[in-house]
Design a protein with these regions (language model features):
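Bacterial N-terminal signal peptides
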Residues: 23-34
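Short, Lys/Arg-enriched N-terminal segments with co-localized hydrophobic residues
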Residues: 1-15
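Bacterial N-terminal signal peptides that target proteins for export
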Residues: 14-24
Length: 231
């Protein structure tokens, strides 16, 4: 975050402003191999404009991970735009097989880049408007990462501690972990801060190369086996 030199950012600006990056993206997409995402869901996920269902006033999303399960309860009145987007992403399998690529035990854990570069590219420009900050970034609260005003897409983070300093920067929580925070606490964070600030995963390469990049260079990262809306 800015007041500590750290913030839950998406590093999209670097990709958007780097023509070489987009050239590499195009090549990667052409050669991308299928992922474990279900065929029908992959078709939906490639069309963000079609996934705009209004979320229930309150709902729970269950995340089955390589370390166990945790449940997030979402309150639409906290952040309507964020809650709606999250509902559609979870419901349609976007987070399935996604890695927890930025884990900082004294700060937060970040995830939300799809492992298929083609799907990831489809969502890069699917931004939603900012919501007013109605809740503080307390421990266990979930919030979108951003790269600036009105830049939220798919990446989210869970606060490991009370991070009230994020509130005036516009980070609007939309839900909280209601069970399994002990699982969230044990997600692998041995790689440290991501590039270019640290030796951890590079978001740009993850966007362009997908999970293959992480599997090769950061094999110990924990991941989401399946995310679903609880009935």
């Amino acid at each position: 975050v800015r007041w500590q030199g750290r913030r839950p950012d998406t590093q999209q600006g670097a990709l958007m402003n780097n023509p070489l990056s987009f050239s590499v993206v195009a090549l990667t997409l052409f050669a991308a191999a299928p992922t474990t995402t279900a065929f029908g869901q992959a078709g939906n996920l490639a069309s963000p404009a079609a996934l705009v269902e209004k979320a229930p006033a309150n709902y729970k999303a269950k995340f089955e991970t390589s370390k166990g399960a945790f449940v997030v309860e979402v309150h639409r009145d906290w952040a309507p735009n964020g809650a709606d987007r999250f509902y559609n992403l979870v419901k349609n399998g976007f987070y399935d097989n996604a890695r927890f690529f930025r884990v900082m035990s004294d700060f937060m854990v970040q995830f939300g880049i799809n492992g298929d570069p083609k799907i990831s590219a489809s969502w890069r420009g699917a931004r939603i408007k900012d919501d007013p900050v109605r809740q503080s970034n307390r421990r266990g609260y979930i919030t979108y990462a951003t790269s600036g005003p009105d830049s939220r897409t798919t990446q989210v983070f869970i606060n490991y501690r009370d991070n009230a300093g994020l509130d005036p920067q516009g980070f609007a929580p939309f839900g909280q972990v209601v069970s399994g925070m002990n699982v969230v606490d044990t997600l692998y964070g041995g790689y440290g801060e991501g590039a270019p600030r640290g030796p951890g995963p590079d978001q740009g390469r993850l966007q362009m190369e997908g999970n293959a990049y992480l599997a090769k260079e950061f094999p110990q990262l924990d991941f989401i086996k399946k995310a679903s809306i609880e009935r």
